Each structure stands twice: as structure tokens, then as C-alpha cells.
Design a protein with these regions (language model features):
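Alpha-helical transmembrane segments and immediately membrane-proximal extracytoplasmic
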Residues: 3, 7-472
Length: 472
């Protein structure tokens, strides 16, 4: 029988060390699990940071935009009250004329110094979010105060311009400046700019759902879940601050408007087609007027805003209802109690004058938006349709006001080509959520009509013009 020799102490030590080495070296599967766990923690931390940054962005944007709204809403009634005394005080007219001339010169200088503040600011913001336009931090520092002051002066001067597009650009500018503080611009700057734009729209309209949809439907932004979280936190914070800190409520108190009865449902597609065609005509007129003024104006940039200001001066003492974006005008439509025939005679010239003045106000690279005038014109056209149907005894008399809402939705969607955003926007501004299903029908048919007429969305055309001008 062979006896096996016992191992020496040296061999025993080597064997133990080999086994110990095998125990301490992790397997590839263990390494992979550890790496996956580390990646999950990193993603969770990054998303948490994005959410916090989005919340801070929304709060900052709400403060800037609500300050703008407070300044405008406080000054505008005082100016109109002062102008209404022109019959008793002869010096009101020449003093206001001098003020508008100086305002036109100031705005011209402001636009010449900072060209990116011209217009609504939405096309510029879309180009930045898409990575097709790059702006330095120094430029953002100039854009924010220039847009704030420029839009305030132009709207208080009476031009038919809105605050909402400028609020989107100011929200993007506020977010871009905050992004520099995060020192994350290279990785998440465009996400924060989109979040600021959405927060700006939310604070301007009091419409968080529309602000969220606007980023993805109109700006055509594609973000990760972290980016969506940042935008969502921004609009939520902006909405809460606008509602509960600054106490802004509904822009159009139409929450008592009821949807059409079942027997009148067939009018919805008709309304969609009419508003779609009207939006196409306005789109072409807006671009045509803007291009014609740019080609044939005898004024330099310093004075290009003077002609619209002079028209605003005349209207201030003749038809002041068409001045400004039109929030008060839309709110007054629901209170019309005249017979349908008298209402039509009142609404038709008012709508034509508002359309013409809005087209002319947007010339000269004036800092100001087209969204609010667009909604006002849609409301006027909707009121015309409702009163016409009421006059023809096609519509029950108590439901004609519903067409004010559908006019706003259809006209907006025809121009912007964002049906979900347009529907959510009007519903959140008015509180008339009972009309939501019918408004969706009008929105999609208006969008289909505009597409069938092969008319590009208005912001696509304005965005293309900016790209061409910067290449030159």
C-alpha cells in the first residue's frame, strides 16, 4: 500500500494563498452587477439634479414673467384712463404723440443693438433648443432686459402685440443664465432652455399643460426621461407660483360656457374648415405684409417702428378697443347682448380693423408676439360665426358664445399647427373644460385643412427667415 507524503509547510502556505486570491477576485458577473448598480445611482442622481434645477428654473421664470405682467397690467389701465380725458385736456394728444415718437426711436435703437429681441422670440428659442442657433452668455444678458423693456414699451404704446411669445423667450433667457450657474451647459443646456421656455409660457397664460405640450409639439424637442422630468418640474413650479404667489387667475373667465347640444354637433367640422382656411389667409397676409415692409420701407431701423406707432396714436382716440393684445376685447365678447343683426354689424368692422392693425403692428421688427392677437382674432371670427348661425336660426340662441372658444382654438391651430397645445391652451385660459372634446374636433380639422391647403406653420416660416438673415 502506497502512503502519500504529507505536504510541507511551504506548500500549505501557497495553497492557502491561492485559495484566498480566488476568493477576493470578483467574477465578471459580479463586476457587471456592480457597474449596473453604479450606473443606476448615477442616473438617479442626475435626474434628481435635473428635477431640482427644473423647479428652480420654473420659479425664477415665474418671478420674471409675473413681474412683467404686473408692470403691464398696472400701467395699461392708467394710460387708457389718462387718454380718455383728451376731450377735457387738449394737451393730452400732443403729449401722447411725442411719447409714441420717442418710444418708436427707443425701440428702434434697442432692436438695432440686440436684433434677437425682434418679433415674438419663439422662432429664435426654437432654433436654440434644436441646436441650430448658438448664443453666448453675454448675449443672453442683453436679451433678457432688452426684451422685457422693449415688449413693455411696445404693448403699452398700443400696438396689437402679445406678451406671450416674448415671455417664452424671456423664460428661455432666464433659464440660460441659471444654466451658467449650474455649470452643466455642455450636457443639459438645451434641456434647461426648453424648460425655461415652457415655464415662460405657463406663467404668461397660466397654462401648465399647454406649456409642456408646446415644448414637445411645437418645438419638436426630443428629450430623455430626465429632460421630461426637468420640463415637467419647471412648468409645475411656474404654475404654482403664478397662481398662489402672484395670484393670477383665468385670463378669460368663460368657465360657464357650455358645449354644443347633440343636434348641433355637425357644425364642429364646418367650424374647423372655416377657421383652418381663415388661418391660412392670415398666415399669408402676415408674412406678405412683413416682407413687403422690409423691402419697401423708407425708414432706417431706428425709425421703422414709427408708422405702427402713428397708427396706434390715431386708434387710441377713435377705436381704442383694438389696441393691445386683445385680452379685454375677448372678455367683452361674451357680454354682447345685442340682437344678432346688430351684433354682426358691430363685430364685422371690429374684426377687420383688428386684423389689419395686427398685421401692421408686426412690421418693423417690433419686439412683441402674435399669439394673443391671434387668439383675439380667432375669438372675433368665432363670435361672427356664432352670431351668423344665431341670426339664421341654425343655432340655439344660448349657445353662440361657444363659438368664441372654438374660433380661438381653430385659428390658433391653423397658424401654429399644434392641435394639442392649442386646445389645452384655450381650455386652461378659459376654464371651459366641458367644451374640451368638441374643441379637439375643431382643432384637428383646422390643422388638417391648413395642411391640405399646403400652408406651412407660421413659426416655421419665421424661423426660416431668421436662418437666412443670419447667413447673410
Amino acid at each position: 500500500m502506497r502512503v502519500r507524503a504529507a505536504p510541507c509547510f511551504r506548500d500549505i502556505g501557497m495553497t492557502i494563498s491561492e485559495h484566498a486570491g480566488k476568493r477576493t477576485r470578483p467574477s465578471p458577473k459580479t463586476l457587471q452587477k456592480s457597474m449596473n448598480r453604479s450606473k443606476r445611482w448615477t442616473r438617479a442622481i442626475n435626474r434628481t439634479l435635473l428635477a431640482l434645477e427644473g423647479a428652480v428654473t420654473g420659479l425664477a421664470c415665474a418671478c420674471v414673467i409675473c413681474a412683467f405682467r404686473l408692470a403691464r397690467d398696472s400701467a395699461s389701465p392708467l394710460i387708457m384712463q389718462w387718454l380718455s380725458g383728451w376731450k377735457q385736456h387738449w394737451w393730452v394728444m400732443p403729449l401722447w404723440l411725442l411719447t409714441l415718437i420717442l418710444a418708436a426711436r427707443f425701440l428702434g435703437h434697442l432692436v438695432k443693438r440686440t436684433p434677437l429681441i425682434s418679433g415674438s422670440g419663439i422662432p429664435q428659442t426654437e432654433l436654440i433648443v434644436q441646436g441650430r442657433l448658438h448664443i453666448s452668455r453675454h448675449d443672453w444678458l442683453r436679451i433678457l432686459p432688452s426684451k422685457f423693456v422693449g415688449c413693455l414699451v411696445s404693448t403699452l404704446g398700443g400696438l396689437s402685440l402679445g406678451r406671450e411669445g416674448p415671455c417664452i423667450q424671456m423664460g428661455a433667457a432666464t433659464s440660460a443664465l441659471l444654466t451658467g450657474l449650474w455649470e452643466r451647459f455642455s450636457t443639459s443646456g438645451h434641456i434647461h432652455i426648453a424648460a425655461g421656455a415652457a415655464a415662460g409660457m405657463t406663467a404668461a397664460f397660466g397654462a401648465p399643460v399647454a406649456g409642456l405640450l408646446f415644448v414637445f409639439e411645437e418645438m419638436k424637442s426630443r428629450f430623455t426621461r430626465g429632460g421630461f422630468l426637468a420640463v415637467g418640474c419647471a412648468v409645475t413650479t411656474a404654475a404654482l407660483a403664478t397662481r398662489y404667489i402672484f395670484r393670477f387667475g383665468l385670463i378669460f373667465p368663460f368657465q360657464n360656457i357650455q358645449a354644443l347640444p347633440l343636434g348641433s354637433i355637425w357644425l364642429l367640422p364646418v367650424m374647423g374648415v372655416v377657421m383652418g382656411a381663415a388661418g391660412v389667409l392670415y398666415n399669408k397676409a402676415l408674412l406678405g405684409t412683413k416682407n413687403a415692409e422690409a423691402l419697401h420701407t423708407p425708414f432706417s431701423q431706428n425709425w421703422r417702428i414709427l408708422p405702427p406707432m402713428l397708427v396706434a396714436f390715431v386708434l387710441a382716440f377713435t377705436v381704442p378697443a383694438v389696441l393691445g393684445g386683445g385680452e379685454d376685447l375677448v372678455g367683452s365678447l361674451i357680454r354682447i347682448e345685442d340682437a344678432p343683426r346688430q351684433a354682426l354689424l358691430l363685430l364685422l368692422p371690429l374684426a377687420l380693423l383688428k386684423i389689419a392693425f395686427s398685421l401692421f403692428s408686426y412690421t418693423g421688427n417690433v419686439p412683441g408676439g402674435i399669439l394673443m392677437p391671434m387668439l383675439c382674432i380667432g375669438a372675433l371670427l368665432g363670435a361672427l360665426c356664432g352670431q351668423a348661425l344665431n341670426y339664421a336660426a341654425i343655432l340655439p340662441p344660448e349657445t353662440w358664445q361657444t363659438f368664441i372658444l372654438y374660433g380661438m382654438v381653430g385659428f390658433f391651430v391653423s397658424l401654429v399647427r399644434a392641435p394639442l397645445t392649442g386646445t389645452a391652451l384655450v381650455m386652461e385660459m378659459s376654464g371651459a373644460f366641458s367644451c374640451l372634446p368638441q374643441a379637439v374636433v375643431v382643432a384637428f380639422i383646422a390643422s388638417w385643412t391648413a395642411n391640405a391647403l399646403r400652408c406651412p406653420p407660421v413659426y416655421d416660416s419665421l424661423r426660416a427667415a431668421i436662418v437666412v438673415s443670419r447667413k447673410k
